[in-house]
A protein has these predicted regions:
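Rossmann-fold dinucleotide-binding core
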Residues: 89-169
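Interdomain hinge/lid region at the active-site interface
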Residues: 161, 205-271, 278-280
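Active-site-proximal catalytic alpha-helix in oxidoreductases
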Residues: 123-124, 128-131, 156-188, 199-211, ...
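Rossmann-fold NAD(P) dinucleotide-binding segment
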Residues: 46-109
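Hydrophobic residues within alpha-helices
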Residues: 1-5, 98, 143, 184
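NAD(P)+-binding Rossmann beta1-loop-alpha1 motif at the extreme N-terminus of oxidoreductases
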Residues: 1-58, 82, 87-88, 118
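Residues in the short beta-alpha loop(s) of Rossmann-like NAD(P)-binding domains
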Residues: 17-18, 62, 133
Length: 280
C-alpha cells in the first residue's frame, strides 16, 4: 500500500515497528532507497514520521498496537488539522475513542479497514470500508483511490470496522467451506483440479475457491493474511454479534478450528491453513 502511494507521487515519511521495512517499500516502488530523490523519508520513531504530516496513515495489527502508537506520542506530534486514516482492523469502540480524542486536539480521523488480501494490496485493488465524517472522507479519497479500486463510505466513524467484521465472518465461512469441500473431493478420489474449474463457473464460485483452493489441494499456504490475525478479527465479529444479541454458530465454529491450528503452531500461516485441520 505504501509503495503504491509512493509510485503515485505522494511524498511519504515512514515508520514501521519492524526495522528495515522502509527498504522493502522502496524496492516495491521500484526505487533505490539509498539514492532516489523521491525515496521515502524514514522517521526514527512514529512521532518523527508524523511531525509535518497533513495525513497520517496507520496499518497496525490490533487495538493494543494502534493505541500504543497513537497514545505514545503521535497524537501530540501531529500538526493541528491533520487527518488520520486508519487502515488497521480494530474494534469499532477503539476507532470511536481515537476519533473523539483526536477531535479534541483539532484533528480528524477516519477508519478505513481494507479487504482483498496481499494480492489486492500489491495491485492497488483493495476494497476500502470507510467510516467518518463526509468532509474527512472526501479529503482522504485521492489517497484511498490509490490503495483500492472500490471506496465505500458506510457511515460515521466505526462503520468501516463494523463492515470489516461482516467481511471476516464471510471469509471464515468461505475459507472453511472450501477447505471442507477440497477434503471431501480428495477423499472421494475426484480429479480435483477439474472439479475446481467446474465449480468456479457455478453457484459455488467465490474468491476463496478462485484464489485458495489449489493451494489447499497442494497443502501449501503462502501468506496472504495471517491465521492469527484473522482469529483476532473473528473475536471482534463475535463481540459485535454478542452486543446485538446475535449468535454466529458458523463463525464460532471456525474460530474454534483456528484456535486449534494456532495452538499447533500455524498462526503465522495463511488463513487457508484451515485445510490442515481436515488432514489431521
Amino acid at each position: 500500500m505504501a509503495a503504491n502511494l509512493l509510485r503515485a507521487g505522494f511524498p511519504l515519511s515512514l515508520y514501521n515497528r519492524s526495522p528495515g521495512r522502509d527498504e522493502v517499500v522502496a524496492a516495491l516502488a521500484g526505487l533505490d532507497s539509498g539514492a532516489a530523490a523521491d525515496a521515502p523519508a524514514v522517521g526514527g520513531d512514529a512521532t518523527a514520521a508524523v511531525a509535518d504530516a497533513e495525513v497520517a496513515c496507520l496499518c497496525l495489527s490490533d487495538d493494543v498496537a494502534v493505541r500504543a502508537v497513537m497514545e505514545g506520542g503521535v497524537i501530540d506530534a501531529l500538526p493541528r488539522g491533520a487527518l488520520v486514516v486508519d487502515f488497521s482492523t480494530i474494534t469499532p469502540a477503539t476507532s470511536r475513542h481515537l476519533a473523539a480524542v483526536l477531535q479534541e486536539g483539532g484533528l480528524e480521523y477516519i477508519d478505513a479497514p481494507v479487504t482483498g488480501g496481499t494480492e489486492g494490496a500489491r495491485r492497488g485493488t483493495l476494497s476500502v470500508l470507510v467510516g467518518g465524517e463526509p468532509a474527512a472522507v472526501a479529503r482522504a479519497r485521492p489517497l484511498l483511490e490509490v490503495v483500492g479500486d472500490r471506496i465505500t463510505h458506510l457511515g460515521p466513524v466505526g462503520a468501516g470496522q463494523e463492515a470489516k467484521a461482516v467481511n471476516q465472518v464471510l471469509v471464515a465461512g468461505s475459507y472453511a467451506a472450501v477447505a471442507e469441500a477440497m477434503a471431501l473431493g480428495s477423499r472421494l478420489g475426484l480429479p480435483m483440479e477439474r472439479v475446481v474449474e467446474a465449480l468456479k463457473a457455478g453457484a459455488a464460485g467465490s474468491w476463496a475457491l478462485e484464489h485458495r483452493a489449489q493451494q489447499m489441494l497442494e497443502h501449501r499456504f503462502p501468506l496472504g493474511f495471517r491465521l492469527a490475525l484473522h482469529r483476532k478479527d473473528l473475536a471482534i465479529a463475535l463481540q459485535a454479534a454478542e452486543a446485538v444479541q446475535l449468535t454466529l454458530p458458523i463463525t464460532a465454529g471456525v474460530a474454534a478450528l483456528e484456535d486449534s491450528l494456532i495452538a499447533a503452531g500455524h498462526g503465522d500461516e495463511d488463513v487457508s491453513a484451515l485445510a490442515r485441520w481436515f488432514r489431521a
